[in-house]
């Protein structure tokens, strides 16, 4: 059974049609990429999947349950988390504290438990701290946990964003341009990290403009153009599709 299914998703803003009849599924354990020119509807699609927007039409099913219309904190609790194109770390806090804060969506003891220092709250806080160090080690930042997050370079902040997302124990992680703004050597390191994430059992859906990265890591690719799906398949199938070459890849080849 597919982990996530999107059924004929459409989204309009006034008279603007941002998405029109987009359907796809994501299988457990795969890397599923969404590509297309600027304005193709990729970010709008992510906003629908995470509950930031509700679809004008269509349905979203995750693990067999209808998520359509849920709020972002509700989709996060169901196991869908997201990183953003512009990293959203707390730059004045430590790297470690960022990962601790990122686990708040899963805390069970609540604010009063934390204030009163109940046994359950103390036990949960210990688990949160242990998880934070575990995730920093996983992404290669264990030696930077006590640094201020804003002192990290772009690649380090990308890794931190992944650690924050993973700390909430997601089943599906949505990555918005995970290698945007970094150099080729750093891209290879992040590709290795994303493979490690996938091999740990977390399913990945990503938006990315860097085609070498997309073609290297993806199991399947969905191509959007002006809010409409124009191709779907393996990297080799998509790369050979004339509509894709004309709408997107051809632009890259020409440059």
Where are these regions (language model features)?
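Glycine-rich phosphate-binding loops of nucleotide-dependent enzymes
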Residues: 1-255
């Amino acid at each position: 059974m597919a982990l996530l299914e999107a059924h004929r998703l459409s989204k309009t803003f006034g008279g603007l049609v941002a998405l029109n009849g987009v359907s796809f599924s994501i299988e457990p354990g795969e890397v599923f990429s969404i590509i297309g020119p600027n304005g193709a509807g990729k970010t709008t699609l992510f906003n629908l999947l995470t509950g930031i927007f509700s679809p004008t039409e269509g349905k979203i099913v995750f693990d067999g349950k209808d998520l359509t219309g849920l709020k972002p904190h509700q989709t996060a609790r169901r196991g869908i988390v997201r990183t953003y194109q512009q990293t959203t770390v707390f730059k004045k806090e430590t790297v470690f504290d960022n990962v601790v804060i990122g686990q708040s969506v899963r805390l069970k003891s609540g604010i009063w438990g934390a204030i009163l220092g109940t046994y359950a709250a103390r036990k949960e806080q210990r688990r949160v701290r242990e998880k934070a160090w575990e995730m920093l080690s996983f992404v290669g930042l264990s030696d930077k946990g006590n640094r201020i997050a804003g002192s990290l370079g772009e690649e380090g902040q990308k890794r931190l964003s992944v650690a924050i997302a993973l700390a909430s124990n997601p089943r599906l992680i949505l990555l918005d341009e995970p290698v945007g703004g970094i150099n080729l050597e750093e891209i290879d390191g992040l590709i290795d990290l994303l493979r490690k994430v996938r091999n740990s059992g977390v399913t990945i859906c990503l938006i990315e403009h860097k085609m070498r990265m997309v073609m290297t890591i993806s199991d399947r690719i969905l191509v959007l153009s002006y809010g409409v799906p124009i191709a779907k398949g393996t990297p080799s199938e998509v790369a050979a599709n004339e509509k894709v070459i004309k709408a997107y890849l051809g632009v890259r080849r020409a440059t």
